[in-house]
């Protein structure tokens, strides 16, 4: 016997969260809970404003229609990426095909303060990896901050994310302030320039490895080995079903590229599932999941070690 419930939720964000020039005051999303006999599976559907093609309202409409079809015996996945991802996670939990083992070693987001980062990294076992957002301020300032961090912490490897913010000139201004001796400790820089060709040129000219992120979701993207490209960053909420995520990871690994499972600012429930996906598909790579502290609460499932209050399922709005 099948049953299901869909929950709508909204979590207040910390004041300083800005995505593509818009301030994100709340994180809005949906959960789907599927039950079959004694088994239960959960999934999160939370399109990311400014990044997802679909809105939260569109996702809700598609999700509710899919749930009704599933209750009637139809299991075909929806095409909308955020809904496909959440539904496939719920189905995987329901059939016990999403392993329980999780990788909670999130690469910490750094605000540029070396002392703060040293404290965050002190308890991190193994490789010291952190992430810095660049492209929000002047490129020269970004270069100086990155150089300072690499100089202050000799065993640090940095992941940088520019979100296509730079022109070729700004990319060169950034690189000018990063000591060439430190550049190989930049694990990768995600999408430095507005076009892929400019990003490729940046990698060739600076020796700083790059990673594809937004490019993966463009219709003309193909997985090929390229000079200067070291990694792909896979955001499942923006990608689609678990099967599509797995296909992308396998395609990257076949080329010798690092594949990083990364957050789209999901709630704690979604983040714990991403940690499980990372342990399953990319066991040797630290995922990019250090986004929970951007929110003011956890929901339904706790992230280990987080002190944020937890909103239980009974407090969420039911849609069925």
Swiss-Prot record:
One of the GO biological process terms: menaquinone biosynthetic process
Record keywords: Lyase, Magnesium, Menaquinone biosynthesis, Metal-binding
Catalytic activity field: (1R,6R)-6-hydroxy-2-succinyl-cyclohexa-2,4-diene-1-carboxylate = 2-succinylbenzoate + H2O
Pathway annotation: Quinol/quinone metabolism; 1,4-dihydroxy-2-naphthoate biosynthesis; 1,4-dihydroxy-2-naphthoate from chorismate: step 4/7; Quinol/quinone metabolism; menaquinone biosynthesis
Function noted in UniProt: Converts 2-succinyl-6-hydroxy-2,4-cyclohexadiene-1-carboxylate (SHCHC) to 2-succinylbenzoate (OSB). Does not show detectable N-acylamino acid racemase (NAAAR) activity with N-acetyl-S-methionine as substrate.
Native organism: Escherichia coli (strain K12)
Family per record: Belongs to the mandelate racemase/muconate lactonizing enzyme family. MenC type 1 subfamily.
EC nos: 4.2.1.113
Entries under SMART domains matching the protein: MR_MLE
Transmembrane segments: none
Entry keyword annotation includes Metal-binding: yes
List of catalytic residues: 133, 235
Name used for this protein in its record: o-succinylbenzoate synthase
Cofactor: Mg(2+)
Residues noted as binding Mg(2+) in the record, renumbered to the chain: 161, 190, 213
Disulphide bond pairs: none
UniProt cross-references to HAMAP family, sorted A to Z: MenC_1
Top-rank taxon: Bacteria
Gene Ontology terms, MF aspect: hydro-lyase activity; magnesium ion binding; O-succinylbenzoate synthase activity
